[in-house]
Amino acid sequence: MAESIARPSVLNATDDDIKNLLAADSHIGSKNLEVRMENYVWKRRSDGIHIINLGKTWEKLVLAARVIATIENPADVCVISSRPYGHRAVLKFAAHTGATAIAGRFTPGNFTNYITRTYREPRLIIVTDPRADAQAIKEASFVNIPVIALCDTDSILNHVDVAIPINNKGYKSIGLAWYLLAREVLRLRGNISRTTAWEVMPDLYFYRDPEEIEREEEQKAAAAAAAEEEAQLAAQTAAAEFEVTDSAAGTVDPTILDNATAGQVGQTTWEGDAEWNITGAAPSEWA
């Protein structure tokens, strides 16, 4: 077994970091074991699954972050993931650290054929899986580009300079690895403090199923439609309270008229008054 790497205590993993790694199944390897990954294995379970030593994982995460932080131009760091589980993670890593992301199929000749439109000359590349990203590692070896890789117990370490032992098959483990790597890089650069928590949550780096996203959008649309329907129903109910449904709309209520006339005293017309029927003689001369 290799001895632990000496490093300042400030770079040690916290209890929360180890708990997150355990919760994401970052320590679960595979049944196959590459001989050069044997130093990173803690034990082998009865079912044949190899358990990764998370202490070694954290050491290599810190080492990889220190290597990345030495690159003056962040855009010279190229992060690659051919596997769908790592697409979102590398894009978020690139957004937070300024690196260049290649999410999806790696076009052959990106690092070696300068005629192609996608030709790049990075100073460092980071891959999610040495098997899936073998073409990128092969081309990097041709032009002497250092390689950092997330390696499972069955990963081939040919042309890999820094291997981070971790479960690179689960989407939570992949997302958490990229999250911790980005956070450590930003801390080493001085962009964020070690004493305060980073406002970005780890699940932002996790892979999301497109069907799940569609279901969430449908649920939001249904909720918005239901809220709009309730608002329209409430408006119709409020308007119905002010509507006149009687056919005598606009006429005087007879009961109100009876009450008004019941209190009158005497004649209600002038024809019944004798004084109003006397015709006066017109004056014959003016004084």
UniProtKB/Swiss-Prot annotation:
Task: Name the InterPro entries on file.
Answer: Ribosomal_uS2, Ribosomal_uS2_C, Ribosomal_uS2_CS, Ribosomal_uS2_euk, Ribosomal_uS2_euk/arc, Ribosomal_uS2_flav_dom_sf
Q: List the disulfide bonds.
A: none
Query: A cellular component term (GO) from this record?
Result: cytosol
Q: Which residues carry this modification: Phosphoserine?
A: 46
Cross-referenced Gene3D superfamilies, in alphabetical order? Glucose-6-phosphate isomerase like protein, domain 1
Q: Look up the further comments and give them.
A: There are 2 genes for uS2 in S.pombe.
Protein name per UniProt = Small ribosomal subunit protein uS2B
Which organism is the protein's source?
Schizosaccharomyces pombe (strain 972 / ATCC 24843)
Gene responsible for this protein: rps002
